[in-house]
Design a protein with these regions (language model features):
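Subtilisin-like serine protease catalytic core
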Residues: 21, 128-241, 256-257, 289-293, ...
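Autoinhibitory N-terminal propeptides
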Residues: 4-6, 11, 17-132, 140, ...
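Active-site core segment of subtilase-fold serine proteases
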Residues: 148-206, 222, 347-427, 517-518, ...
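C-terminal subdomain of the subtilisin-like protease fold in secreted/lumenal serine endopeptidases
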Residues: 39-43, 255-276, 285, 289-300, ...
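Hydrolase catalytic cores
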Residues: 209-212, 217, 230-241, 246-260, ...
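C-terminal outer-membrane/trafficking sorting elements
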Residues: 616-687
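Positively charged n-region of N-terminal signal peptides that target proteins for export
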Residues: 1-4, 687
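Catalytic-core segments of hydrolase enzymes
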Residues: 164, 259-354, 360-361, 398-513, ...
Length: 687
């Protein structure tokens, strides 16, 4: 019956002309979002600045453009920079011959108790079965997020002092401070206390930071309760995330401390082989770093058939009711493709939009005034970009159109040689019963931002499936404990690499709530704990998602960094491969649901301690040191870390300072490991 209707509709469409539409050819330098900004008077006019990637024709152009347009260039990767451009200068910058490309990228989405027990982080904090306890002391945890409550007791130490050392609020509207040309930096306890919070509309960052480094004053402590925090309140742009990573790495270097960074935001749009601008820039910042680790959420799209994969595919593109969606069609290197977008009335067959877009060269176009009832607001911006690393083409679409219930979009993709990957940002793909059409898949729903080679990409499992609010309301979820969280995004990457790298508890996770946020930001049934400190009541609540799983991993990595401050991402992957938890329901690992399994903090620590025995540490640098028997103080020069071991290899003391008191140790012979800027050295010291 459906086939007969389809044939009738096709015949009708032949007899009805397509309604007129307005078509504008735009600069080929622009991606779809940049084209939107430049070609529309409605979008983001209130913003004084625009965050973008700028690719230059040569090095000399940078200083010239800075002076001419007051551009702030920040992080560099090859000939491309993250940049802050005055909104009034955007058109002129885009037209400047010294600018090879100007891409705005996509807006980031938020990737939104029992956890410590399930991954055995509680055993590290208590020191169970180990020579010492591990709480993250001496380690930094950097969180790039939004909705931070700097006053929450979850971020205080045992004496009540705030463990947040530094904050960069990228959204602060006061006069910019810091090196990046936007936002404000709070770099003292007084400034952080005075600011109190970054905004009153979100609480995500307070929850995420609490998972990674909550103080443990309640049952709902974080993974690394004695780690210090450095926060970046993000503007949710790709460039803001890259600049934030750069900021945190520089802060760690300036303070001579190891750092674990967490990013629980991302976007589905972009090249998913790790070669996209954002993934590539983050990789360039992290590559070769010791003691600088990063976790990133894979996203919560695992329940949505938002991906089309194939050489020749047709499907109905189910755009959300709000009418706004983005589509990114990625070819493999050396291939080409065409994409036909069709908007029609299912009943009458009337066609409102029909155009075929092709790769082979870079271009950017805008279409307006199509459709039926919403013609005046209808907008479709499309651009074809070429990856300057792999040479692969992609076509990006930004659609804004409130379609009628009888209208639908369809997409037809044809490639020359290899499979094409198409991703819908907010919608999904469905065959709708049409002959020759296919449903979308939830494969390759991993966020573009989690496809890099350096960060650890984290999926989510279920920590618990029932909880009771402080008002007595019980919530029961239809999830299997320790099973994959149904929304946790799946791999593989478009180049075949497995993602996620690892999974961690991320569903029904309890953590702290931004006390400055409006009550509507959290449902009352999800608030499970409260505590009054200094006359003010603070709350803890339940949230779900890979946003919660990623900081679990960041916190565990902080514990591992406490044991080995020079730990690398490659070493972390080895630990995960050897020690992650496995059960038969996960299937053969690694796979694109669970990665290498669920992180096991204790097993990873034991493996780390076993593989960094004193006998394996080379003597590559001579550190200057002296021991004062009267004061029992060990003093060193040019060292980053000091570790003191018993003669049988048990770790007894450690510090990231150049001086260490041994007054708490009994008389005897000890081994002291000194890590300097040029290498490591082991000395014997008799007290």
């Amino acid at each position: 019956m459906r086939k007969i209707f389809l044939l009738t509709a096709c015949c009708l469409s032949l007899s009805l002309p397509m309604r007129a539409q307005h078509h504008i050819v735009l600069s080929s330098k622009l991606d779809a979002r940049a084209a939107q900004l430049l070609s529309s008077s409605r979008l983001e006019q209130s913003a004084n600045i625009v965050h973008a990637y700028i690719t230059l024709t040569d090095d000399a152009a940078k200083a010239q453009l800075e002076q001419q347009y007051s551009i702030r260039f920040n992080v560099r990767c090859g000939d491309t920079y993250t940049a802050v451009i005055p909104r009034s200068a955007l058109s002129a910058v885009a037209a400047d011959v010294r600018v090879k490309a100007l891409y705005v990228g996509e807006q980031m989405k938020l990737m939104t108790d029992e956890v410590r027990k399930q991954i055995h982080a509680d055993a590290l904090q208590s020191g169970s079965g180990l020579s010492t306890s591990y709480t993250g002391k001496g380690v930094l945890i950097g969180v790039i997020d939004m909705g931070f409550d700097f006053t929450h007791p979850n971020f205080a130490d045992a004496t009540g002092h705030c463990r947040i050392l530094n904050v960069w609020d990228q959204n602060a509207v006061v006069a910019p401070s810091g090196a990046y040309g936007y936002g404000s930096v709070y770099n003292s306890p007084a400034a952080i206390k005075a600011a109190a919070h970054d905004n009153t509309s979100a609480t995500h960052g307070t929850h995420v930071a609490g998972i990674a480094a909550g103080s443990g004053i309640t049952l709902y402590g974080g993974m690394a309760p004695e780690a210090d925090l450095v926060l970046v309140s993000t503007n949710r742009t790709e460039q803001g995330i890259v600049d934030g990573v750069d900021y945190l790495l520089k802060y760690a270097k300036q303070t001579n401390r190891p750092i674990a960074i967490n990013v629980s935001l991302g976007t589905m749009m972009g090249f998913k082989d790790g070669s996209g601008l954002m993934a590539r820039m983050v990789d360039s910042l992290l590559t070769g770093q010791q003691g600088c680790l990063m976790s990133v959420a894979v996203g919560n799209e695992g329940n949505r058939n938002s991906t089309l994969i194939g050489r020749s595919v047709k499907s109905v593109w189910k755009v959300p009711a709000a009418g706004a969606d983005q589509l990114f069609v990625e070819t493999r290197p050396g291939d080409s493709c065409s994409v036909r977008l069709l908007l029609k009335d299912k009943n009458s067959g009337e066609v409102f939009f029909d155009h075929t877009f092709s790769t082979g060269k870079i271009w950017s176009e805008r279409y307006d005034s199509f459709g039926s009832a919403d013609k005046t607001r209808a907008s479709l911006v499309a651009s074809c970009i070429k990856n300057d690393v792999t040479g692969a083409y992609a076509i990006s679409f930004h659609v804004g159109y409130s379609q009628q219930s009888s209208e639908e979009w369809s997409v037809e993709i044809e490639s020359t040689n290899q499979r094409v990957f198409a991703y819908s940002n907010n919608g999904y793909f469905s065959a709708e019963g049409y002959e020759g059409y296919v449903d979308g898949t939830n494969s390759s729903t991993v966020a573009m931002t989690a496809t890099g080679n350096e960060p650890i990409a984290v999926g989510a499992t279920v920590s618990k499936n029932r909880y009771v609010s402080i008002s007595g309301v019980e919530t029961i979820k239809p999830w299997a404990i320790s099973g994959r969280y149904p929304l946790s995004a799946l791999g593989p990457c478009s180049d075949g690499r497995i993602k996620p790298d690892v999974v961690a508890p991320g569903a029904s996770v309890v953590s702290s709530y931004n006390s400055f946020a409006a009550a509507r930001t959290v449902k009352g049934a999800d608030v499970v704990y409260r505590k009054t400190v200094g006359g003010k009541t603070f709350y803890w609540y339940v949230e779900n998602g890979t946003s919660m799983a990623a900081p679990t991993v960041a916190g565990v990595m902080a514990l591992w960094l406490q044991a080995k401050p020079t730990l690398t991402a490659a070493e972390v992957r080895t630990l995960l491969a050897k020690t992650s938890y496995y059960n038969s329901s996960m299937g053969q690992l690694p796979n694109n649901q669970y990665g290498m399994g669920q992180i096991n903090a204790l097993a990873g620590m034991r493996e780390l301690l076993n593989t960094t025995s004193l006998s394996e540490i080379p003597t590559t640098a001579s550190a200057l040191y002296a021991y004062d028997a009267v004061t029992e103080m060990l003093s060193t020069q040019a060292t980053r870390y000091i570790f003191v071991y018993s003669i049988d290899g048990q770790l007894l003391l450690q510090t990231s300072h150049q001086n260490l008191s041994l007054s708490g140790l009994p008389a005897g012979l000890y081994l002291v490991r000194l890590i300097g800027l040029q290498g490591e050295e082991i000395i014997k010291l008799r007290k």
